[in-house]
Amino acid sequence: MANNKSAKKRAIQAEKRRQHNASRRSMMRTYMKKTVAAIAAGDKEAATAAFAVVTPILDRMATKGLIHKNKAARHKSRFFAAINAL
């Protein structure tokens, strides 16, 4: 446990960041699941709409450092390929 004032402050800040990141990660995963569900249902219009929503979210999370930029690119590429295959 933190023994001095600055270490206690850093622990509090780290916990705030962890909660904030967990919220953002959950939101990102929710939109990804909606896209996957639309693709699985075979509804190209809904899948395209969901993809249009999830793309900027993935880009934003990669820019903020929540996920790696290659992970965002991989998800976008796979979603795009799956939608085109419908």
Swiss-Prot record:
It holds the Pfam family Ribosomal_S20p. One of its GO terms (molecular function) is structural constituent of ribosome. GO terms for biological process: translation. It comes from the Bacteria. One of its GO terms (cellular component) is small ribosomal subunit. Residues 1-27 are annotated as: Disordered. InterPro entries: Ribosomal_bS20 (IPR002583), Ribosomal_bS20_sf (IPR036510). Keywords: Ribonucleoprotein, Ribosomal protein, RNA-binding, rRNA-binding. Belongs to the bacterial ribosomal protein bS20 family. Binds directly to 16S ribosomal RNA. This is Small ribosomal subunit protein bS20. It comes from Vibrio cholerae serotype O1 (strain ATCC 39315 / El Tor Inaba N16961). The lineage of its organism: Bacteria, Pseudomonadati, Pseudomonadota, Gammaproteobacteria, Vibrionales.
